[in-house]
C-alpha cells in the first residue's frame, strides 16, 4: 500500500511514529454532524418541546471528550456549522453556547420539555450510521454522553451494515430517529457548507 488517505482513529497514535511511513496529518474542512428529522415525535422544530429537546441534546454531548478520547485528538469540537479551515469561520457566533457541553443546563432544558410532553420509557432517540465506515465508536460515545447526562434510556445506536444500506434508508426516509450526516465542501466557502 503506497497511499492511505484515511487512518482509523484507533491507529492514529501509532502511525505518526511508525518509521516505515511518511505521515501527513493536517486539519481539513469536513464537518461531521447528525440530523434529527424536523417532524420526529418529541423533536419537532415547530414546537417548544422539540426546540427545548434539541437544545438539551446538543448540550448533553461532550464533544471535547469525544475528540480527545475517541478520535485521539483528530477532531475539533464544533462551535458553528463550518470547519476552522473554511473562510469566514468564527468561533464566537451568537448562540454557539448551544454547541458546548453543559450538563446542568441540558438537564434543565430536558425537564422543561418533559413538562410539556413527558419522555417515557417507550421513547428513545436512535442514532443511525453505517457500520462499515468507522463510526461505531463515535456514535457509542455520543449516546453514552447523552444517556449519562439526560438519563440511561434516552438514546441508542442504530447501525446499518453498509453505507449503501444506510444511505438507502436515509434517502427513502425510513430512518425513524437521528442519522449521521456531514459535509466536505466542494470549494472553500462557508456558503457551500451552509446552503448545500
Residue ranges, per PLM feature:
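Structural transition elements
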Residues: 76-113, 132-137
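Alpha-helical secondary-structure segments
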Residues: 29-79, 122-133
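Ligand/substrate-recognition segments at binding pockets and active sites
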Residues: 6-10, 111-185
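Extracellular/periplasmic solute-recognition and catalytic clefts
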Residues: 1-40
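Soluble non-cytosolic domains of exported or imported proteins
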Residues: 6, 47-52, 60-61, 96-104, ...
Amino acid at each position: 500500500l503506497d497511499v492511505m488517505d484515511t487512518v482509523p482513529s484507533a491507529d492514529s497514535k501509532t502511525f505518526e511514529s511508525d518509521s516505515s511511513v511518511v505521515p501527513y496529518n493536517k486539519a481539513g474542512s469536513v464537518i461531521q454532524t447528525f440530523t434529527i428529522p424536523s417532524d420526529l415525535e418529541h423533536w419537532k422544530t415547530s414546537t417548544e418541546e422539540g426546540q427545548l429537546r434539541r437544545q438539551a441534546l446538543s448540550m448533553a454531548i461532550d464533544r471535547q471528550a469525544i475528540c480527545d478520547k475517541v478520535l485521539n485528538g483528530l477532531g475539533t469540537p464544533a462551535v458553528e456549522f463550518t470547519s476552522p479551515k473554511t473562510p469566514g469561520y468564527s468561533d464566537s457566533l451568537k448562540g454557539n453556547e448551544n454547541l458546548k457541553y453543559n450538563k446542568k443546563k441540558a438537564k434543565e432544558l430536558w425537564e422543561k420539555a418533559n413538562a410539556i410532553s413527558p419522555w417515557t420509557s417507550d421513547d428513545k432517540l436512535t442514532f443511525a450510521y453505517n457500520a462499515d465506515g468507522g463510526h461505531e465508536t463515535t456514535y457509542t460515545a455520543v449516546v453514552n454522553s447523552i444517556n449519562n447526562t439526560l438519563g440511561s434510556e434516552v438514546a441508542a445506536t442504530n447501525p446499518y451494515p453498509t453505507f449503501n444500506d444506510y444511505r438507502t434508508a436515509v434517502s427513502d426516509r425510513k430512518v425513524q430517529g437521528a442519522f449521521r450526516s456531514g459535509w466536505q465542501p466542494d470549494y472553500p466557502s462557508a456558503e457551500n457548507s451552509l446552503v448545500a
